[in-house]
Amino acid sequence: MDPKISEIRKSYTLSSLEIEDAGSDPVLFFQKWFEEAVQSEVLEVNAMTLATVTQDGKPDARIVLLKGILKESFLFYTNYESRKGTELETNPNVCLVFFWPELERQVRIEGNVTKVSREVSKEYFHSRPRESQIGALASPQSQKIPDRKFLEGRFQKFTNQYQNKEVDLPNHWGGYAVYPCRIEFWQGRSSRLHDRIVFERDTSSSWEKFRIAP
């Protein structure tokens, strides 16, 4: 291993996390942390790793953007025919990870996904920049394409098709809601003795809260 890589390390000293601080509702506590990250001007504060599993059990992950919290679920939008979309169709279990280094914090959310209603997807779709709406139509996401000109040609085709018209929400595009069953809040501490507070749903659908070792 390159010694320069192995020597990279940082001591975390900004804050602490007591179990009492997390309250009784992990979604509300997430919103509190998220707002603090926004106020701290974290770059791409809503960026999160979305981990999925392929049909043959291989892990897969990518960065997507959180686009809302609705009825205790975390929302993101994508092409349903993309690689992630096909994986979610066969296995709805996912994990989300937020990392906010400016605050020395991480949040892990385990749960399962369901598609949101077409009405919810349509409302968000039409809130996007027009170019992004056309891009969703033009891009056969995760499919092989011959070159970039192919993509640019499709973009121009749909730009012309929808000139002076509202862009239709594609049938293959929409939102997912992640319903959590476990949420972990991680606060960096000195000596690698980090604070880790976990909320886990029990059989009664209420939350159990406990501390785990770093």
UniProtKB/Swiss-Prot annotation:
Organism: Leptospira interrogans serogroup Icterohaemorrhagiae serovar Lai (strain 56601)
Protein name, as recorded: Pyridoxine/pyridoxamine 5'-phosphate oxidase
Transmembrane segments: none
Gene expressing this chain: pdxH
Enzyme nomenclature, EC number: 1.4.3.5
Source organism superkingdom: Bacteria
Pathway stated in the Swiss-Prot or TrEMBL entry: Cofactor metabolism; pyridoxal 5'-phosphate salvage; pyridoxal 5'-phosphate from pyridoxamine 5'-phosphate: step 1/1; Cofactor metabolism; pyridoxal 5'-phosphate salvage; pyridoxal 5'-phosphate from pyridoxine 5'-phosphate: step 1/1
GO molecular function, one term: FMN binding
Amino-acid positions noted as binding substrate in the UniProt annotation, renumbered to this chain: 9-12, 67, 124, 128, 132, 192-194
